[in-house]
Amino acid sequence: MIVAMGELILLRHGETEWSRTGRHTGLTDVPLTPAGEAAAAALAPAIAGRDIRCACASPLQRAARTAALAGLTDVKQDPGLREWDDGGYEGLTTPQIREQRPGWYLWRDGVIPGGPGYPGETAEQVGARADDVLTRVTPLLADGDVVLVSHGHFLRVLTARWLRLGPSEGRMFRLGTGTVCTLGTEHGEPVITSWNVPPC
């Protein structure tokens, strides 16, 4: 049972040039596009008036900038919120990867090691990071809301783990850029209260 008065608010960063063109973006620190900055700023009403106990963001600039544009203050940088390391598939599109591995699917087949700084991660490794984040922030929900500003694949894995599903079950939760989701409880059990909501 989870004792929570607040909700876990998830913000996915705004659009980047790589996300716009379908390139797998793990640890490469790409900036928001102008459209991404506008979408990030438009997230502000979704969190205005919330009783925010804590706000944390991935240290990658696309997430940190989204947090700032959404009006969050006193944001803690949390390396645990970084995106899934795409390893040797960093910067490639799914069609490009499938030229090498026909039928490839991230959630089933994973990634290959890349160059220095891009060793790649398995779904289980990303799930372990998500578990660590949840272990640290869930107690704070007893006093109010917690905002996490992060990345598409990581937030999908985190949501699966919140629901006590395996990390790869994150494949079921499609998530666009510049969107807000909320995770909460019902009768002490974890639920999704809203998902993939675009800015107003």
Language-model features: where?
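Internal catalytic-core helix/loop-beta-alpha segment
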Residues: 104-108, 112-141
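Short active-site segment of divalent metal-dependent hydrolases/proteases
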Residues: 16, 154-155
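Loop-to-helix element that buttresses phosphate recognition and phosphoryl-transfer chemistry
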Residues: 8-66, 116-131
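Short basic (Lys/Arg) and small-residue
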Residues: 151
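Phosphate-coordination/substrate-recognition cap region in phosphate-metabolizing enzymes
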Residues: 2-3, 42-105
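Active-site signature of alpha/beta-hydrolase-fold catalytic machinery across serine-
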Residues: 69, 157, 161
